[in-house]
């Protein structure tokens, strides 16, 4: 049974969140009555309002109004006044992933999972299915530049979603095709152990029906190990690995662009197909790997090589994924969501490969628990930056953990051998340091999942103000 349109008003607690806003927008576009609340004003909240969705700021019981269904995410505490009011009114309380699964049930669905790279890969799959005229529904964990939003309500049979593993609810998603980009020791506050993370991803793949398939990156040892344990589902492997079914090779870089080839080898038919001189308007081998996952799916769905090439070349990227925010005196400034050591390392490697000058990393640690679990990894992930500036920790509601703060991280990075790492406190410190020692052709890269994106967007304007007139060069 499909969820009836006359189910009543659906209320989203935390509707401005990147995961919730896309689901709310698609339900609204499909004709359902949608409203919600969030703690603060944001670009997502404003976008939803422009579409006609009523959004309250602040969480109060009266915000529910005449709601008949209440949707919440793991971030919503059970002490939330709206959650309590919904319980008292005996309204259905639905987890975010269950609502996403409801959208997927009556479509052919692709779920993109993995510890890192999900958002970019989801966007790339969407771009190639767009190019192939599939007109998909898309719900992503980041703003897709081509759409100006994190969702798309297409009329086609296919749906592409980002599968968030952070709270384990991605196992509820009914996917016909499952992608796993990588598996790392992340979200241990939920899983408790790395073995539990491994088990969850195995279940994610094994949930694929017999007529579907999994797309697994065998450049990552954990994913290659997972591929070896799947014996009752069709698996397509990808990566730079010479044994991959869909392999990328012959990379060449031109600033922020990458050229490469892809070799597709079918284990079913033995047939080989080469896609030559593909252009990806992004830097970084990790992004080429993400693109290769999308190519594997597009090829399997019968999209022509020409349309794959076109879709890839026209890919507009994702907000906060190595996004250029501006420049000043030839210094290029970028914003990236990377907050895990693996992500930080990949972004800085891409910056190093692209920059003609030095790389200056400005990192905002995200959550004390992540620092605690991955302290040694954080100490070793900044090697491709000439200078590292560490900001105060963005706590995301957590209490500090003694011995695992920003000052301790700075000392730990120094002890691991980095030659120039410093503690900073605010944007004023960044303006002062960058204006004094950065030079033309240097890259300044902001990293973090917290509010550091505001610094990244503000810095070009602040620096241009030092000249007494606006020399800001926007993207």
Swiss-Prot record:
GO terms for cellular component: cytoplasm. GO terms for biological process: cell division; cell wall organization; peptidoglycan biosynthetic process; regulation of cell shape. ATP binds at residues 114-120. Its EC number is 6.3.2.8. Pathway: Cell wall biogenesis; peptidoglycan biosynthesis. Keywords: ATP-binding, Cell cycle, Cell division, Cell shape, Cell wall biogenesis/degradation, Cytoplasm, Ligase, Nucleotide-binding, Peptidoglycan synthesis. InterPro entries: Mur-like_cat_sf (IPR036565), Mur_ligase_C (IPR004101), Mur_ligase_C_dom_sf (IPR036615), Mur_ligase_cen (IPR013221), Mur_ligase_N (IPR000713), MurCDEF_pg_biosynth (IPR050061), UDP-N-AcMur_Ala_ligase_MurC (IPR005758). It catalyses: UDP-N-acetyl-alpha-D-muramate + L-alanine + ATP = UDP-N-acetyl-alpha-D-muramoyl-L-alanine + ADP + phosphate + H(+). HAMAP family: MurC (MF_00046). NCBIfam families: murC. This is UDP-N-acetylmuramate--L-alanine ligase. It comes from Bartonella tribocorum (strain CIP 105476 / IBS 506).
């Amino acid at each position: 049974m499909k969820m009836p349109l006359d189910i009543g008003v659906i209320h989203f607690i935390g509707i401005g969140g990147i995961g919730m806003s896309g689901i709310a927008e698609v339900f609204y576009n499909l004709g359902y009555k949608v409203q919600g609340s969030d703690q603060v004003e944001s670009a997502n909240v404003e976008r939803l309002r422009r579409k006609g969705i009523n959004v309250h700021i602040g969480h109060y019981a009266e915000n529910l109004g005449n709601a008949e269904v209440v949707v919440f995410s793991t971030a919503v505490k059970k002490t939330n006044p709206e959650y309590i009011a919904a319980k008292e009114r005996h309204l259905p309380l639905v987890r975010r992933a269950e609502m996403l699964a409801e959208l997927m049930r009556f479509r052919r669905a692709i779920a993109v999972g993995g510890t890192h790279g999900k958002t970019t890969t989801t966007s790339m799959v969407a771009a190639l299915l767009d190019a192939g005229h599939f007109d998909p529904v898309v719900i992503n964990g980041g703003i897709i530049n081509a759409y100006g939003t994190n969702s798309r309500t297409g009329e086609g049979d296919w749906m592409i979603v980002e599968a968030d593993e952070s709270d384990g609810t991605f196992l509820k998603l009914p996917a016909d095709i499952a992608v796993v980009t990588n598996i790392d020791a992340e979200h241990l506050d939920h899983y408790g152990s790395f073995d539990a993370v491994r088990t969850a991803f195995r279940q994610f793949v094994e949930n694929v029906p017999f007529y579907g398939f999994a797309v697994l990156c065998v450049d990552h040892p954990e994913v290659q190990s997972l591929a070896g344990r799947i014996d009752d589902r069709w698996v397509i492997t990808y990566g730079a690995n010479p044994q991959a079914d869909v392999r990328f090779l012959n990379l060449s870089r031109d600033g922020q662009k990458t050229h490469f080839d892809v070799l597709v080898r079918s284990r079913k038919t033995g047939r080989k197909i080469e896609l030559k001189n593909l252009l990806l308007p992004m830097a970084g081998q990790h992004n080429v790997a993400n693109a290769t996952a999308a190519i594997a799916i597009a090829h399997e769905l019968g999209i022509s090589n020409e349309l794959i090439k076109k879709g890839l070349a026209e890919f507009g990227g994702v907000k906060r994924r190595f996004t250029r925010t501006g420049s000043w005196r030839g210094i290029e400034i970028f914003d990236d969501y990377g907050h895990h050591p693996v992500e930080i390392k990949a972004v800085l490697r891409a910056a190093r490969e692209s920059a003609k000058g030095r790389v200056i990393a400005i990192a905002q640690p995200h959550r004390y628990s992540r620092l605690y679990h991955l302290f040694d990894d954080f100490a070793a992930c900044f090697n491709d930056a000439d200078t590292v500036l560490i900001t105060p920790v963005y706590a995301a509601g957590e209490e500090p953990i003694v011995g695992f703060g920003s000052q301790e991280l700075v000392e730990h990075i120094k002890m691991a051998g980095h030659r120039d790492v410093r503690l900073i406190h605010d944007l004023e410190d960044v303006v002062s340091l960058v204006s004094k020692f950065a030079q033309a052709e240097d890259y300044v890269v902001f990293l973090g999942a917290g509010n550091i994106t505001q610094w990244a967007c503000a810095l070009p304007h602040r620096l241009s103000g030092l000249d007494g007139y606006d020399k800001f060069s926007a993207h």
